[in-house]
């Protein structure tokens, strides 16, 4: 089972010297009950955003442009593919920068949550600010981007995802009605008033976060700027059960190789004949395997065969087309996968600036949100992952395949990257890297004979079933044909 949750925050604050002397009450501020949606009722989450007013002179009053009627239509297959490709490119851009600056051994973040936040902001962005947002998201869908992303998310993993959103506003803050309407329609974010009492507001916000993440994130905010005028919150909760569960009785302590010299002990989930589809990339040589969940999702492992790698190198040439392999068949495989418990929190201001969004934190044009001059002052993100044995028994057809002899092995006992992908579109929901799944343990020097040589996770190429080749023209090692499987003998 994989249990994931994510929260993103943008905050709008108002500089007291530039704000209107007195905001008049806004009647649209109504308390919003917790919205946790699953199945067809689920809605999108906007990340928690913190924005504040800067010292620019107010510009002309520009209402947010209403999206064309075409935006309200269901996305075409081609639009869905283009959006999924764009999201994968954004994901690799974002995670490469985060990995470069992080000193933590394990990372996890939700590019979907970040993209939802930026597309939410795009509802009120104008001119160059809007253009930069679309460029960073690699979006070519024009004004329909928030609508397409919203519709795509509503169709994700029925029963596995719960999405929640909330918006907090300072009483009387002059926000555009169109922005409020579209925020609720596309992201499920209704406005709720801040009381003006910091302690009470913090308690209310953190209580909502705790409920939306089922108690996994507590005390997300420790302070609230005195001049806060707007908070946009979203929470993503994903619970994925393995389509073929791991037997807890087979889980045992194993060695995870940190590098050529040291290992740490870790609980390894195991299966002798696990239905897996995998392939091998070269230059650099990377083993890729899709572990299927129910609800059309997969945990995708990318494991370089050498220790000397960084995320930027691995992701440099990784595209949507490489990971999207719907034609690959599953094969029974000997599998070892470490149990994981990851949590990571970071401020994304520097990373988003490096991606080209410096203007958001200096002088953005957000007059589609309010005629007041706003600037993004903080973007906080937190994600976590728990990986364990629980799953749902495979269907009869899969059980038959699993009864055949395993022809290969996929042993995840060295540093790796991972994605949580939606299978039909390969839309990335979460991305992360694991260099040490047990950072609290004392590394142990390993014996020479225990050192993996970079090939152990697959059988040596000489041992591949007949008909298989180490590399085919598109640099992928596909599963063998049906005739390569050992067939059970007929009972006499």
UniProtKB/Swiss-Prot annotation:
Locations listed in the record: Secreted
Amino acid composition bias (Basic and acidic residues), ranges on this chain: 443-475
Gene3D superfamilies: Alpha-1-antitrypsin, domain 1, Antithrombin, subunit I, domain 2
Tissue specificity of this protein: Expressed by the liver and secreted in plasma.
Phylogenetic classification of the source organism: Eukaryota, Metazoa, Chordata, Craniata, Vertebrata
Site (Reactive bond for chymotrypsin): 405-406
Disulfide bonds: 71-144
SUPFAM superfamilies: Serpins (SSF56574)
Gene Ontology CC annotation, any one: extracellular space
Species of the source: Bos taurus (Bovine)
Region ranges (Disordered): 56-76, 433-492
Family the UniProt entry places it in: Belongs to the serpin family.
Protein name stated in the entry: Alpha-2-antiplasmin
């Amino acid at each position: 089972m994989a249990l994931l949750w994510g929260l993103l925050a943008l905050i709008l604050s108002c500089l007291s010297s530039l704000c209107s002397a007195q905001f008049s009450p806004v009647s649209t501020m109504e308390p919003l009950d917790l919205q946790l949606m699953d199945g067809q009722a689920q809605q999108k989450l906007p990340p928690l955003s913190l924005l504040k007013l800067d010292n620019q002179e107010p510009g002309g009053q520009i209402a947010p442009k209403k999206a064309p009627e075409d935006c309200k239509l269901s996305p075409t297959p081609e639009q869905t593919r283009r959006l999924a490709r764009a999201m994968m490119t954004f994901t690799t851009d974002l995670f490469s920068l985060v990995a470069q600056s992080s000193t933590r051994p394990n990372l996890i973040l939700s590019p979907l949550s970040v993209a939802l936040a930026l597309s939410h902001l795009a509802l009120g962005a104008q001119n160059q600010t809007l253009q930069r947002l679309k460029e960073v998201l690699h979006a070519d869908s024009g004004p329909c981007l928030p609508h397409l992303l919203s519709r795509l998310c509503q169709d994700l993993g029925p029963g596995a995802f719960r999405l929640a959103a909330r918006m907090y506003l300072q009483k009387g803050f002059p926000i555009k009605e169109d922005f409020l309407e579209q925020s609720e329609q596309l992201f499920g974010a209704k406005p709720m008033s801040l009381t003006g009492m910091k302690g009470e507001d913090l308690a209310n916000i953190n209580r909502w976060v705790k409920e939306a993440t089922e108690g996994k994130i507590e005390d997300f905010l420790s302070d609230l700027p005195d001049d806060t005028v707007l908070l946009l919150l979203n929470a993503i909760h994903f619970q994925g059960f393995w389509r073929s569960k791991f037997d807890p009785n087979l889980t045992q302590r194993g060695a995870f190789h940190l590098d050529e010299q040291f290992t740490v002990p870790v609980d390894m989930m195991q299966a002798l004949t696990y239905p897996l589809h995998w392939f091998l990339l070269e230059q650099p040589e990377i083993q890729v395997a899709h572990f299927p969940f129910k609800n059309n999702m997969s945990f995708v492992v990318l494991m370089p065969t050498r220790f000397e790698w960084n995320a930027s190198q691995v992701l440099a040439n990784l595209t949507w087309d490489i990971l999207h392999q719907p034609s690959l068949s599953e094969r029974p495989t000997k599998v070892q996968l470490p149990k994981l418990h990851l949590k990571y929190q970071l401020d994304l201001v520097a990373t988003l600036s490096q991606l080209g969004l410096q203007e958001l934190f200096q002088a953005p044009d957000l007059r589609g949100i309010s005629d007041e001059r706003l600037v993004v002052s903080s973007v906080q993100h937190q994600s976590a992952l728990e990986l364990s044995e629980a799953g749902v028994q495979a269907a009869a057809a899969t059980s038959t395949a699993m009864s055949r002899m395993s022809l290969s092995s996929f042993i995840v006992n060295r540093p790796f990257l991972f994605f949580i992908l939606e299978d039909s579109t390969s839309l990335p929901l979460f991305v992360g890297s694991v260099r040490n799944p047990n950072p609290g343990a004392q590394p142990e020097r390993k014996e020479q004979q225990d050192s993996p040589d970079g090939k152990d996770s697959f059988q040596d190429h000489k041992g591949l079933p007949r008909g298989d080749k180490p590399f085919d023209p598109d640099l992928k090692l596909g599963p063998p044909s049906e005739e390569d499987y050992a067939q059970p003998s007929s009972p006499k």
